[in-house]
């Protein structure tokens, strides 16, 4: 090679180096393409093997037990917190139930009491788990979280929920009790005739707008323990956080309801197929708005935010929001201002023993 450099003119040497570099780049490119082709082939073989295994299991004959197919045996519980867009979301479930072939049932408790007696807890658990005629089922109602496992149930229902900024939720509830909403405008409300604004209520130290009224989302997630309903309990908040992470399939926020619906449709299409499109383009009959609602002033908000109860409820809300946004970030991608659900991003390979 050294002799060649001596004998070759500089221009030819440069051309030789360039030609060698181009050849190496070409080879690297071809190797990369071969690697990609090999990976695609491995994935295709893996998918084929999975299909063969599934077919073999299908050909083995019907399942020996008499239980329903898993999707047909599914039960969802939406233990809805008042004034979190719960009626708007529930009406989407009602709009889809005939088309998607599932049942929707409202859990109506006496005086809307979110805490059930022990005997009612047992009845409720037995009803939901054994009522096969109502499966697949979507149950909704203003009931605090109930741990099915402690009643000896093997297959627990899927819990979902939506929560809201605690002050916004309280303001909405305050005006709802006085003026109702556009969903049932003729219904007489409990506080109808009271024209006092939320700002005036807070300024006067009224009971309907007291910080204690903020304590609702934490106990709904905490459950049926007495400490859950002890206003300002740190234990209750910690338990609510634990349940949100470990016992709830998905918890959305009112402020991002469409994204919550989109994630449910992607993960649970048996119930929510078509829900996103219905929410975006439907006649909006499912939407519900409190009437005569006036936004609170900055002074009113600042006064409520001085409360330790608000601080805890807000901490729980921020915790739920962060978890929801984490789930969404791993499930969707944004393009041209719109969100798109990601396709399946895993596959199986190296499946043994090999099929004949």
Curated annotation (Swiss-Prot):
Keywords recorded for this protein, A-Z: Coiled coil, Disulfide bond, Glycoprotein, Golgi apparatus, Membrane, Signal-anchor, Transferase, Transmembrane, Transmembrane helix
Topology, Lumenal side: 29-356
Residues in compartment: Cytoplasmic: 1-11
GO BP, one annotated term: heparin proteoglycan metabolic process
Pfam families linked to this entry: Sulfotransfer_2
Claim: Disulfide bond is one of the keywords in the record: yes
Membrane topology value: Single-pass type II membrane protein
Positions glycosylated per UniProt: 108, 127
Compartmental location: Golgi apparatus membrane
Enzyme active site: 140, 142
InterPro entries cross-referenced by the UniProt entry: Heparan_SO4_2-O-STrfase, P-loop_NTPase, Sulfotransferase
Protein EC: 2.8.2.-
Ranges in a coiled coil: 24-51
Quaternary structure and interacting proteins, as annotated: Homotrimer. Interacts with the C5-epimerase GLCE.
Function: Catalyzes the transfer of a sulfo group from 3'-phospho-5'-adenylyl sulfate (PAPS) to the 2-OH position of iduronic acid (IdoA) or glucuronic acid (GlcA) within the heparan sulfate (HS) chain and participates in HS biosynthesis. Required for metanephric development of kidney formation, suggesting that 2-O-sulfation within HS is essential for signaling between ureteric bud and metanephric mesenchyme.
Name of the featured protein: Heparan sulfate 2-O-sulfotransferase 1
Source species: Pongo abelii
Gene, per the UniProt record: HS2ST1
């Amino acid at each position: 090679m050294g002799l060649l450099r001596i004998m070759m003119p500089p221009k030819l040497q440069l051309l030789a180096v360039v030609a060698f570099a181009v050849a190496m780049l070409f080879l690297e490119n071809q190797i990369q393409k071969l690697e990609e082709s090999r990976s695609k082939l491995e994935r295709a073989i893996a998918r084929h093997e999975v299909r063969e295994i599934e077919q073999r299991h299908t050909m083995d004959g019907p399942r020996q037990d008499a239980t329903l197919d898993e999707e047909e045996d599914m039960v969802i519980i939406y233990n809805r917190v008042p004034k979190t867009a719960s009626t708007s979301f529930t009406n989407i479930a009602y709009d889809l139930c005939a088309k998607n072939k599932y049942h929707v049932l409202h859990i109506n408790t006496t005086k809307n009491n979110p805490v059930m007696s022990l005997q009612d807890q047992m009845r409720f658990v037995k009803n939901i788990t054994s009522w096969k005629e109502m499966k697949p089922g979507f149950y909704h109602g203003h009931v605090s979280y109930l741990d099915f496992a402690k009643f000896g149930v093997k297959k627990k229902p899927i819990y979902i929920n939506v929560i809201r900024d605690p002050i916004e939720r309280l303001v909405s509830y305050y005006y709802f009790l006085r003026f109702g909403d556009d969903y049932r405008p003729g219904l007489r409300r409990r506080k109808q005739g009271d024209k006092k604004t939320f700002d005036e209520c807070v300024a006067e130290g009224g009971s309907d707008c007291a910080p204690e009224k903020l304590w609702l989302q934490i106990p709904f997630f905490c459950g049926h323990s007495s400490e859950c309903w002890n206003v300002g309990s740190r234990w209750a908040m910690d338990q609510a956080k634990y349940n949100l992470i470990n016992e709830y399939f998905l918890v959305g926020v009112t402020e991002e309801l469409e994204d919550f619906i989109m994630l449910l449709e992607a993960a649970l299409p048996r119930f929510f197929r078509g829900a996103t499109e219905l929410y975006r383009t439907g006649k909006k009959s499912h939407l519900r708005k409190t009437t005569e609602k006036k936004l609170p002033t900055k002074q009113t908000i600042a006064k409520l935010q001085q409360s330790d109860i608000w601080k805890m409820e807000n901490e729980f809300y921020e915790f739920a929001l962060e978890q929801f946004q984490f789930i969404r970030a791993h499930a969707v991608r944004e393009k041209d201002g719109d969100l798109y659900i990601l396709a399946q991003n895993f596959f199986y390979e190296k499946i043994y023993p090999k099929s004949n």
